[in-house]
C-alpha cells in the first residue's frame, strides 16, 4: 500500500521502484485506484490478501479503505493479513478490527534480546484479546533465538530465509554475507541461524526456494487460468506461451483458414497459437517468434525467433 517506511533496515529487499516512494502495487501491477485492486484480485481468484509496505500503518486510512472494499466485494471469508514494523496500540487495532484477520509484527533486530519488554509484546497481548490472530514474521538473522520467549504470546512465529536483493546487496557485503549459490537469492548461513529457535508447532520456516519456486508459480497459475486467451498455452510454471507474426506482405487468406479463437490481430502484428505459427510459418512473410511471459500482460521471460528454425 506504500513504499514509505519509518525504518531503514539494512536487509530490506524492497525494489528501487517501490522503496521510499508512496506508490501502490497489487502483486506486480502498479495500481492507482481501488477498482484496480479488485480487478487484480479477481484476475487470480484470490482467497485472501496480504497488506504490505513499506509500512502500511503510515497510511492507515488507505489500509482501512482498501480492506473495507475487499471485505465488501469478496465477503467476510476473504482473509486479510497485515505486515507491520510498528506495534499498533488499541486505537489503531480498533480501526482494523473486523477488516484485518491477522497481524504479522516485524520488531527491529536490535529489540529481539529484550522482546518481552517491548511495545511489540504488549501489542501482541492486546491484539489477541481483541480477536486478531497475531504473530511475528522476520527474516532469519543472527540472534533469532532471542524471540523464543515471545512464543506464549503469539499464534505463530514465521521465519523467512534471508534473501539477497538489489537494494540491500551493499549492506550485506559490508557484513561479510554472500549468496548461497548463483541460482537462488538465499543468503549463505541464514538457514543455520533459523535453527536457533526451538522446535515448536508455532514456528514456521519459509525458504527462499519455496517463495520463488512455489508461491510465485502458484500465483501465476491462478492468474493464467483466469486471463489466458484461448490460443495461449499455460505452462507448468504459470507462464503463457504464444506465437507472434509481424507480417510484411499479404497473408493470402491465412487468417480466414483459422478458427477465431486461434489468433488475435494487434497493432502491427498477429498473435496466435504458437503451434499454428510453427506449422504454417514457412509460407508467411514477416518476422516470426514465440513469446513466453507472465500472464495478464506481465513480464516477458523469453522470446524465441522462429524464422531460422522454420527454414531448417
Predicted feature locations:
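Canonical radical SAM enzyme core domain
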Residues: 19-35, 57-98, 102, 106-118, ...
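Radical SAM enzyme core and accessory elements
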Residues: 234-312
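Short, well-ordered coil/turn segments that N-cap beta-strands
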Residues: 45-47, 76-80, 99-101, 130-132, ...
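Acidic (Asp/Glu)-rich catalytic clusters
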Residues: 39-43, 96-99, 124-125, 151-152
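Short, acidic/turn-prone active-site loops that include or flank metal/cofactor-
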Residues: 107-112, 161-165, 290, 294-296
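Canonical Radical SAM [4Fe-4S] cluster-binding loop centered on the CxxxCxxC motif
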Residues: 1-31
Amino acid at each position: 500500500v506504500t513504499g514509505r517506511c519509518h525504518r531503514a533496515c539494512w536487509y530490506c529487499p524492497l525494489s528501487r521502484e517501490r522503496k521510499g516512494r508512496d506508490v501502490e502495487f497489487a502483486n506486480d501491477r502498479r495500481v492507482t485506484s481501488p477498482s484496480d485492486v479488485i480487478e487484480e484480485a479477481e484476475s487470480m481468484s484470490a482467497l485472501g490478501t496480504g497488506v504490505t509496505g513499506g509500512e502500511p500503518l503510515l497510511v492507515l486510512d488507505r489500509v482501512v479503505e482498501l480492506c473495507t472494499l475487499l471485505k465488501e466485494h469478496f465477503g467476510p471469508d476473504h482473509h486479510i493479513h497485515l505486515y507491520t514494523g510498528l506495534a499498533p496500540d488499541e486505537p489503531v487495532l480498533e480501526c482494523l478490527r473486523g477488516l484485518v484477520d491477522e497481524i504479522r509484527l516485524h520488531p527491529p533486530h536490535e529489540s529481539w534480546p529484550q522482546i518481552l519488554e517491548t511495545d511489540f509484546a504488549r501489542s501482541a497481548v492486546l491484539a489477541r484479546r481483541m480477536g486478531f490472530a497475531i504473530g511475528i514474521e522476520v527474516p532469519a538473522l543472527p540472534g533469532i533465538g532471542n524471540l523464543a520467549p515471545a512464543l506464549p504470546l503469539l499464534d505463530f512465529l514465521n521465519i523467512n530465509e534471508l534473501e539477497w536483493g538489489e537494494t540491500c546487496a551493499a549492506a550485506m557485503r559490508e557484513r561479510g554475507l554472500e549468496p548461497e549459490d548463483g541460482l537462488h537469492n538465499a543468503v549463505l548461513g541464514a538457514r543455520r541461524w533459523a535453527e536457533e529457535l526451538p522446535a515448536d508447532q508455532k514456528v514456521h520456516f519459509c525458504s527462499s526456494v519455496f517463495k520463488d519456486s512455489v508461491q510465485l508459480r502458484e500465483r501465476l497459475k491462478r492468474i493464467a487460468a483466469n486471463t489466458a486467451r484461448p490460443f495461449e498455452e499455460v505452462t507448468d510454471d504459470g507462464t503463457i506461451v504464444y506465437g507472434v507474426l509481424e507480417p510484411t506482405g499479404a497473408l493470402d487468406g491465412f487468417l480466414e483458414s483459422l478458427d477465431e479463437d486461434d489468433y488475435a490481430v494487434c497493432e502491427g502484428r498477429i498473435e496466435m497459437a504458437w503451434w499454428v505459427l510453427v506449422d504454417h510459418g514457412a509460407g508467411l512473410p514477416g518476422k516470426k517468434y514465440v513469446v513466453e511471459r507472465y500472464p495478464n500482460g506481465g513480464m516477458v521471460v523469453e522470446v524465441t525467433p522462429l524464422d531460422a528454425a522454420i527454414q531448417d
